[in-house]
C-alpha cells in the first residue's frame, strides 16, 4: 500500500476511511498521511502480530499512531496462540486492550500466576480472548486465580 499525491510531499487534509484490515505499520502510514484528526479504521481494524502491536510492556508507536486517529479501532492479534505469556506480555496485552474502546481479539496461553494479571472485563475495550491455563490449579488459591482470569 502506498499513498501518493502528485506534486506534493506534504501531509494533506484528507478524510480517510480504511475498508480492509491493516498492519500496525500500514495503519501508522495511513494515519500520518492526513492532518485531519481522525481516520476511520472501523471496517477492517488492525490485524498484526503481538510483537508489532506492543513493545515489552506497552503499545507500539505504530499502534499509538493508529489509536490517536481512531480510539475505537478493533484489533486482532494474529499470533495463534500467544504461547507461555510472561508477566511483561500480560502487561503489554493489558496496555493494548486499554488503548482502544474497540474489540481486542487474541488467543493466549500461560501459567495461572501470570494470566491472573489480565485486566478484567468491563474496562474500556471489549475483549474476545481465548485463554488456556497451562498449569494445574487447585484449592482455594487456584479458584481465586482462575476467577481473576
Regions found by a protein language model. Name each.
Residues 1-149:
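Solvent-exposed, low-complexity segments and loops of surface/extracellular structural proteins
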Amino acid at each position: 500500500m502506498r499513498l501518493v499525491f502528485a506534486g506534493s510531499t506534504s501531509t494533506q487534509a484528507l478524510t480517510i476511511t480504511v475498508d480492509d484490515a491493516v498492519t500496525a505499520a500500514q495503519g501508522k502510514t495511513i494515519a500520518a498521511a492526513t492532518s485531519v484528526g481522525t481516520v476511520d479504521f472501523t471496517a477492517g481494524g488492525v490485524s498484526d502480530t503481538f510483537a508489532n502491536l506492543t513493545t515489552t510492556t506497552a503499545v507500539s508507536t505504530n499502534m499509538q499512531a493508529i489509536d490517536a486517529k481512531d480510539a475505537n479501532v478493533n484489533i486482532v492479534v494474529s499470533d495463534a496462540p500467544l504461547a507461555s505469556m510472561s508477566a511483561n506480555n500480560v502487561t503489554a496485552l493489558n496496555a493494548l486492550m486499554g488503548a482502544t474502546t474497540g474489540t481486542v481479539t487474541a488467543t493466549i496461553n500461560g501459567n495461572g500466576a501470570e494470566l491472573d494479571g489480565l485486566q478484567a472485563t468491563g474496562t474500556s475495550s471489549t475483549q474476545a480472548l481465548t485463554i488456556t491455563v497451562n498449569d494445574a490449579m487447585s484449592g482455594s488459591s487456584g479458584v481465586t486465580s482462575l476467577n481473576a482470569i
